UniProtKB/Swiss-Prot annotation:
Keywords: Ribonucleoprotein, Ribosomal protein. It comes from the Bacteria. The gene is rpsB. One of its GO terms (cellular component) is cytosolic small ribosomal subunit. Belongs to the universal ribosomal protein uS2 family. HAMAP family: Ribosomal_uS2_B. This is Small ribosomal subunit protein uS2. Gene3D superfamilies: Glucose-6-phosphate isomerase like protein, domain 1, Helix hairpin bin.
Length: 257
């Protein structure tokens, strides 16, 4: 299991919250105190809640669920993309389209459109079109890729969602809650923790803090996926052994007859 240390959290600045005048009182249980007008997050609680979130993500992936990484603010975009790709999951790091989950059937049509245009460029079909029309296809492709590129391979709704800054991703969380999709999130002192199933109290603005916690969640996905693959392989080998044993019994019975 991937662990997280107080040293790592301190070095990444995970303990720095928002200004005391910009806070959500519901975050009081996760706050250690204030320093120079800034709330300091209780990192002992961050470690504790991180472990719960990590285990939940790992077990969910072990059971076959997929994870959607969401973080559209500038500080989160690179980490969300890189860590989701590293663990083989989907992501949204640009604009969240309203209905991306609740109206996934329609969004899927746009994804299929992107795939068709991609195929035209890959197999050379695009060359049969006039230059002006080909340019329009390219513009559409770039636009769709920017918004939908991270979920291009998502054929069904995710089993859970990992979010950076729930205050910024309010619509995404509302859609997840409506569909009963659990949410794991980095929750800063200005956020409402109530809609979040697995709160990770922490700085959701500093790039280093975001990268650290995102990478740990990606590690949880990888660990869960490895355990799932091992279990499936063992099941497959067990079935093969049982089949071989059955054949041997039949052969022995035939020989005795």
């Amino acid at each position: 299991m991937s662990s997280i240390s107080m040293k790592e959290l301190l070095e990444a600045g995970v303990h720095f919250g928002h200004q005391t005048k910009r806070w959500n009182p519901k975050m009081k249980p996760y706050i250690f105190g204030a320093r120079n007008g800034i709330y300091i997050i209780d990192l002992q609680k961050t470690v504790r809640y991180f472990k719960s979130a990590y285990n939940f993500v790992k077990e969910s992936v072990l059971n076959g669920d997929t994870v959607l990484f969401v973080g559209t603010k500038k500080q989160a975009q690179d980490s969300v993309c890189e860590e989701a790709q590293r663990c083989g999951m989907h992501y949204v790091n640009q604009r969240w389209l309203g209905g991306m989950l609740t109206n996934f059937t329609t969004v899927k049509q746009s994804i299929d459109r992107l795939k068709r245009i991609d195929a035209m460029f890959e197999d050379g079909t695009i060359e049969a079109y006039p230059k002006k029309e080909a340019l329009q296809f390219e513009k559409e492709r770039v636009k769709l890729q920017k918004i939908l590129g991270g979920i291009k391979g998502m054929n069904r709704l995710p089993g859970l969602m990992f979010v950076i800054d729930p205050k910024n991703e309010e619509i995404a969380i509302q859609e997840a809650k409506k569909l009963g999709i659990p949410v794991v999130a980095i929750v800063d002192t200005n956020c409402d923790p109530d809609p979040i199933d697995y709160v990770i109290p922490g700085n959701d603005d500093a790039i280093r803090a975001i990268r650290l916690l995102s990478s740990k969640m990606a590690d949880a996905v990888i660990e869960g996926a490895q355990a799932r693959n091992a279990a499936l392989q063992a099941e497959k080998e067990g079935a093969a052994d049982a089949e071989t044993a059955g054949e041997q019994v039949v052969e022995e019975e035939v020989a005795q007859a």
